[in-house]
């Protein structure tokens, strides 16, 4: 429990209007309390950490000077919005972030009127803010609209599409874009723009000019002296900063300024509030600011489990192998014997398990920044030249490159392997990061082969199978650990389109896909039913399914994907095409976006854990409920 008496100023702030009652001279103390409160609260509950520490001063300045929620703040990505949540009526609930029934991990319109746009994926803020500014302009509304973008989001093409549109409009919309430049996404930001911004902020000449002025005038600058120094600095900045890029796109550029210097932020924002048309303010921040361990390990402290801020994160001992670990090990093993293998990630080196590969095979590793569309077509181009690219990508981010998957890869039947991490139920990160649609949107694409492993050993075999297959393949696996089946060191392959009969029983066939094989087997063995590990979503094992349809009363399909258009739909379509009428119960995720909760709670809620499978069976075939098989036996 947090002692509010340790935060006397912050305790007076329930909404931003309360913040505006403070004198500007008091805001430094408010910022210190807010940063310390964030450290203490996230230490208790876990959650996104370093990004929020980096925008404490910026968040305070924005809510202090802008009349939120009338004025609109549009945050990009959302990792950095814990300070925003704390200042907008959710301070006492911040420790519930990511927990079932608690605060969402990202801005969410249903949660607060101060959350003007729901986010979780990157690079959407400028487009959304521009849309708001256009409508305000049409209505003659004087509200201010501010997009805050950073954490690598400016490496995505969508941001430039919005800048290009906004800067070329007539009449010009009143829009402020704040570039929060911390040179990071989750991993280090990469690419030409990042290097250009780095040249601006790291210029020795510019810093020498700035520091020289401080030494000469100290804290005794008059207003006239301060104006002179600002003009002199702006003149020199023009020689070092990327103002030309944004100016040519139709934006008035201001910066770069220190994003932790509250007087500088307040001064710049006061001026920008009075200006018309598209404006861009470039601020330099440090991810993890104010917590030394996070500043020193910005990747490690991006998102954290509960920890003691006095001690920092404790290095975990030996842990159970995750599916991501299986992929990471397989990738390096296959690269050792297959020189054609190239690996691509859209800014998710750590999360997708590419750290070791990037170190051992740096010339074969391509981090394209937050650019999923480019990543996939880059892979397509590589494949045309005989390479075998492996695209390591989260299921939720694969959605952002769907046209490229369809048009550039599948249409041309190019040899690209998609290692789709975080498929199905993801858990605490909520709806924006769930992988509950991928089986549906991949299954319908011609030329695609699609697999989902039941365990770690099978995941390795599927990756090898996909690598050696001629054509586009997706291996879709979940977040976290599996049942603990240790993979072989071999690079064995599976026969394409062949399922695995796990248990030969009678009456009902339970068809499990991916992680849902485990509950199917737990229930099926107990009740003497047939259990199948389907392995392939596409192509399905037609021979086995037709044989089972001939010898069983009904099927139950079980998948951690939405039922609509999913793996079970494929089974029904196959039987229908053969003119076979058979009762089928489809178990899967509901036609709804997942909320944040633990994976276990979400699986149970969807009825695809062992207890849910058992209950569904009894609902359709009540006579299966014999005395020897109570619900408790399989829950």
UniProtKB/Swiss-Prot annotation:
Cofactor binding remark: Binds 1 Mg(2+) ion per subunit. Binds 1 thiamine pyrophosphate per subunit.
Alphabetical keyword list: Isoprene biosynthesis, Magnesium, Metal-binding, Thiamine biosynthesis, Thiamine pyrophosphate, Transferase
Quaternary structure and partners: Homodimer.
Function as written in the Swiss-Prot or TrEMBL entry: Catalyzes the acyloin condensation reaction between C atoms 2 and 3 of pyruvate and glyceraldehyde 3-phosphate to yield 1-deoxy-D-xylulose-5-phosphate (DXP).
Reactions catalysed, as given in the entry: D-glyceraldehyde 3-phosphate + pyruvate + H(+) = 1-deoxy-D-xylulose 5-phosphate + CO2
Residues binding Mg(2+): 151, 182
Domain of life: Bacteria
Top class in the EC scheme: transferase
Gene from which the chain derives: dxs
Cross-referenced CDD domains: TPP_DXS, TPP_PYR_DXS_TK_like
EC numbers, comma separated: 2.2.1.7
Cofactor section: Mg(2+); thiamine diphosphate
Similarity-based family: Belongs to the transketolase family. DXPS subfamily.
Recorded metabolic or biological pathway in which this protein acts: Metabolic intermediate biosynthesis; 1-deoxy-D-xylulose 5-phosphate biosynthesis; 1-deoxy-D-xylulose 5-phosphate from D-glyceraldehyde 3-phosphate and pyruvate: step 1/1
Gene Ontology molecular function terms on file: 1-deoxy-D-xylulose-5-phosphate synthase activity; magnesium ion binding; thiamine pyrophosphate binding
GO biological process, one term: isopentenyl diphosphate biosynthetic process, methylerythritol 4-phosphate pathway
PROSITE patterns, per database record: TRANSKETOLASE_1, TRANSKETOLASE_2
Record-linked HAMAP family: DXP_synth
Binding-site residues, thiamine diphosphate: 79, 120-122, 152-153, 182, 291, 372
Listed name of the protein: 1-deoxy-D-xylulose-5-phosphate synthase
GO cellular component assignments: cytosol
Pfam families associated with the record: DXP_synthase_N (PF13292), Transket_pyr (PF02779), Transketolase_C (PF02780)
């Amino acid at each position: 429990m947090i002692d509010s008496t340790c935060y006397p100023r912050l305790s007076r702030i329930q909404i931003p209007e309360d913040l505006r009652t403070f004198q500007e001279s008091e805001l430094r103390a408010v910022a210190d309390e807010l940063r310390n409160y964030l450290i203490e609260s996230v230490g208790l509950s876990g959650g996104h950490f370093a990004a929020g520490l980096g925008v404490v001063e910026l968040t305070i300045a924005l809510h202090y000077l802008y009349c939120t929620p009338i004025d609109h703040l549009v945050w990009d990505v959302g990792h950095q919005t814990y300070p925003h949540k704390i200042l907008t009526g959710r301070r006492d609930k911040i420790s519930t972030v990511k927990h079932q029934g608690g605060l969402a991990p990202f801005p969410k319109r249903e949660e607060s009127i101060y959350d003007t746009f729901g986010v979780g994926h990157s690079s959407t803020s400028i487009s959304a803010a521009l849309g708001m500014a256009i409508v305000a302009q049409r209505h003659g509304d004087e509200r201010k609209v501010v997009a805050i973008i950073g954490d690598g989001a400016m490496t995505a093409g969508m941001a430039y599409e919005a800048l290009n549109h906004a800067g070329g409009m007539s009449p010009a919309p009143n829009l402020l874009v704040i570039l929060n430049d911390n040179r990071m996404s989750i991993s280090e930001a990469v690419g030409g723009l990042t290097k250009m911004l780095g040249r601006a902020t790291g210029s020795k000449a510019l810093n020498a000019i700035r520091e020289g002025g401080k030494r000469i005038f100290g804290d005794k600058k008059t207003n006239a002296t301060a104006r002179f120094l600002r003009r002199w600095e702006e003149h020199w900045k023009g020689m070092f900063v990327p103002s030309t890029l944004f100016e040519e796109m139709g934006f008035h550029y201001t910066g770069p300024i220190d994003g932790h210097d509250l007087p500088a932020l307040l001064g710049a924002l006061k001026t920008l509030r009075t200006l018309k048309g598209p404006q861009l303010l470039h601020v330099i921040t440090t991810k993890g600011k104010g917590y030394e361990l996070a500043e020193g390990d910005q990747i490690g402290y991006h998102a954290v489990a509960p920890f003691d801020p006095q001690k920092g994160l404790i290095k975990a001992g030996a842990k159970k192998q995750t599916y991501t670990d299986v992929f990471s090990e397989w990738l390096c093993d296959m690269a050792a014997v297959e020189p054609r293998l190239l690996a691509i990630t859209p800014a998710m080196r750590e999360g997708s398990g590419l750290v070791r590969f990037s170190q051992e095979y740096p010339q074969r590793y391509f981090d394209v920044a937050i650019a999923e569309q480019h990543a996939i077509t880059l892979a397509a181009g590589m494949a045309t030249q005989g390479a075998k690219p492996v695209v390591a990508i989260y299921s939720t981010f694969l959605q952002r490159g769907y046209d490229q998957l369809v048009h550039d890869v599948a249409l041309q039947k190019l040899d690209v392997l998609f290692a789709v991490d975080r498929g199905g139920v993801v858990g605490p990160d909520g709806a924006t990061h769930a992988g509950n649609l991928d089986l549906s949107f991949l299954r319908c694409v011609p030329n695609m082969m699609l697999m989902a492993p039941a365990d770690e050993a099978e995941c390795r075999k599927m990756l090898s199978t996909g690598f050696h297959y001629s054509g586009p393949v997706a291996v879709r696996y979940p977040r976290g650990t599996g049942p603990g089946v240790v993979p072989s060191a071999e690079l064995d392959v599976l026969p394409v389109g062949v399922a695995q009969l796990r248990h030969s029983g009678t009456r009902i066939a339970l068809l499990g896909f991916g992680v849902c094989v485990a509950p199917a087997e737990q229930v099926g063995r107990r009740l003497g039913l047939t259990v199948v590990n389907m392995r392939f979503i596409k192509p399905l094992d037609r021979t086995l399914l037709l044989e089972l349809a001939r010898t069983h009363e009904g099927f139950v399909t079980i998948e951690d994907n939405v039922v609509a258009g999913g793996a079970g739909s494929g089974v029904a379509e196959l039987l229908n095409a053969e003119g076979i009428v058979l009762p089928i119960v489809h178990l899967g995720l509901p036609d709804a976006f997942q909320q944040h909760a633990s994976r276990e709670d979400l699986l149970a809620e969807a009825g695809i854990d062992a207890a849910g499978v058992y209950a569904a069976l009894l609902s359709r075939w009540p006579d299966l409920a014999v005395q020897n098989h109570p619900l408790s036996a399989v829950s």
